[in-house]
Amino acid sequence: MGTDTAQATARPVRTQQPGRLIVDWLTTTDHKKIGHLYLITSFAFFLIGGVMALVMRAELARPGMQIVDNNQFNQLFTLHGTIMLLLFATPTFAGFANEIMPLQIGSPDVAFPRLNMLSYWLFLFGGLIVLGSLAVPSGPAAFGWFAYAPLNSLERSPGIGADMWIMGLALAGFGTILGSVNFLTTIIGMRAPGMTMFRMPIFTWNTLFTSILVLMAFPVLAAALLVLEADRRFGSQVFDAANGGALLWQHLFWFFGHPEVYIIALPFFGIITEIIPVFSRKPIFGYLTLIGATAAITGLSVVVWAHHMFATGAVLLPFFSFMSFLIAVPTGVKFFNWTGTMLKGSLSFETPMLWATGFLVSFLFGGLTGVILASPPLDFHVTDSYFVVAHFHYVVFGTVVFATFGGFYFWWPKFTGKMLDERLGKIHFWTLFVGFHTTFLVQHWLGAEGMPRRYADYLAADGFTALNTLSTIGAFLLGMSTLPFLYNVWKTARYGRKVEVDDPWGFGRSLEWTTSCPPPRHNFVTLPRVRSESPAFDLHHPAHAGEAPQPEPKHEQADREPS
């Protein structure tokens, strides 16, 4: 037996053929590879949606129709909004959750690896169906990403492109629902010994709350989409305007739509919360209040949907206005936590910290204009104007894109075993930051001056030309900022040095920084003891470990008592 074992271990390791590599990735159930697939696919959708935005901005730079006609413009903003929210932002959450969450709780994988794989394929093919509507003769859907009735009816949107939009989103939505079931089960049932709920990293907490929100919001969207398809193809009349169907659609859609904004915000808040303590050299300020604020946002986000419907005159304005003001309070608490962590910290502005700081500035602007829009008298004046477009992009782009790039630069060594180039990262950040604010800051003024959203053209006499031209210049700078990032990824993959340590930043706090870069197939060779919410810091800096230790659970104490 000893000889056989020696011979077995002496066999040379076979290099994997390209064909086998492709099959391995297509059939993988490894949460890290599935996370890679989510992030790569969603970033590809981000690039496609960005090109659509640049075409629209090029059209709006000057009065008159230059590039696209009215219907093509409608198709562009419909697909742009759909792609960015449902095919980029939402699956990017799933990508980061797959990559990082099992590592942070000390789990070898997610609870249902095959369901995880199915979730990705549902998202991919749902997204391809939506994008495939570009190839049909009648063109893609042109009714806006919230598909208001009666515009979404067969009479007003007769092409097959609208049906592909509906069924593609339903399919991708089922993938999101199944993925959230997986994340919830993993967090509740697969934590490492010692990893109590109140020792979990904030990103994992936010993944938990986001998954709960998905299970409340996405089934409503899926049901509404399937009923809409029944209206279009089987003659049911649920969303018929004569039966009040137009308002019914708005209620159903926004009951999904507003939680969706927090579905694509909370996990990215979590990413920022992971980055700031590492580059402040301090534990997160107010760990418990951060969790409480996230719980409050989760609860409040399902009772504010009708602030999107103030202009209908058919909703209770005082209630929805008050609840919309109220949701700003826990968000403000988070800001105190983030700035409190940075205060008196030993700050260093490596690229991930730059993105986190850029997020704080951008999201603060978006939050302040959100408080303005929560007031019905003010909302009546700027609803469906570029003021709303600017607010929405400050909130969503300011959160999702800044935090996504921050997460990429922060966890890239954990994903790939190589560090992205810092100089290129800083060029990337500053070009994107300047381009973003140049694009969207002026749109607040355009909206206040009365420029409606979703118009393909305007008159020179309207006085919108100068600000639109400036916004378009900013948009192209914003688009160009992606080039240094893509070059950085290529350069790092080709020439980057291998990371030899578990924690290349030196001050990582959560459990993913206690395993190799990249981790082995089942994540950990050995698990360190978890005695606080910063197990990696405790392991690598034992002199400072447990400066504010939490009491250990009774069952752990009992396990160590001599029998």
From Swiss-Prot:
Statement: the UniProt record of this protein carries the keyword Coiled coil: no
Membrane topology summary: Multi-pass membrane protein
Subcellular location: Cell membrane
Amino acid composition bias (Basic and acidic residues), ranges on this chain: 552-563
Cofactor: Cu(2+); heme
Position of the 1'-histidyl-3'-tyrosine (His-Tyr) cross-link: H258-Y262
Pathway connected to this protein: Energy metabolism; oxidative phosphorylation
Stretches the record annotates as Disordered: 536-563
GO BP field: electron transport coupled proton transport; oxidative phosphorylation; respiratory electron transport chain
Keyword Coiled coil carried by entry: no
Family matches, as Gene3D superfamilies: Cytochrome c oxidase-like, subunit I domain
This enzyme's EC code(s): 7.1.1.9
Residue positions binding Fe(II)-heme a: H80, H393
GO cellular component: plasma membrane
Cofactor note: Binds 1 copper B ion per subunit.
PROSITE patterns: COX1, COX1_CUB
MF terms in GO: cytochrome-c oxidase activity; heme binding; metal ion binding
Catalysed reaction equations from the record: 4 Fe(II)-[cytochrome c] + O2 + 8 H(+)(in) = 4 Fe(III)-[cytochrome c] + 2 H2O + 4 H(+)(out)
Binding annotation for heme a3: H391
Entry's family note: Belongs to the heme-copper respiratory oxidase family.
Oligomer and partners: Associates with subunits II, III and IV to form cytochrome c oxidase.
Name the record gives this protein: Putative cytochrome c oxidase subunit 1-beta
Organism: Streptomyces avermitilis (strain ATCC 31267 / DSM 46492 / JCM 5070 / NBRC 14893 / NCIMB 12804 / NRRL 8165 / MA-4680)
Gene: ctaD2
